[in-house]
Amino acid sequence: MHPDLSPHLHTDECNQLITLLKQCHKEHNVLKFFGTCNDMDRAMRECLRKEYQTKRERSKAHAEEMRRRLKEQPKEHP
């Protein structure tokens, strides 16, 4: 099962691989069940995995920055 393959959610590189996989599935209606498109599927999944890891790292860095900024703010209590 793949994540949402909408183009606005992915990089150009992954979108190109997604398009190639969909095209392969259209061209090989029956052979896709026998592994004809598996290489493209693996490449697409690897690209999506890298994209996911990048997003996780960026989110983690952002969260750490937010925590640091919250700790540095002076506490203003009346």
From Swiss-Prot:
Region feature Disordered, mapped onto this chain: 52-78
Location of the motif Cx9C motif 2: 37-47
Cellular-component GO terms for this entry: mitochondrion
Main subcellular localisation: mitochondrion
Motif Cx9C motif 1: where in chain: 14-24
Subcellular location: Mitochondrion
Domain CHCH: 11-55
Annotated Pfam families: Cmc1 (PF08583)
Disulfide bonds: C14-C47, C24-C37
Keywords in alphabetical order: Disulfide bond, Mitochondrion
Record's function text: May be involved in cytochrome c oxidase biogenesis.
Family: Belongs to the CMC family.
Protein name: COX assembly mitochondrial protein 2 homolog
Species assigned in the record: Danio rerio
Lineage: Eukaryota, Metazoa, Chordata, Craniata, Vertebrata
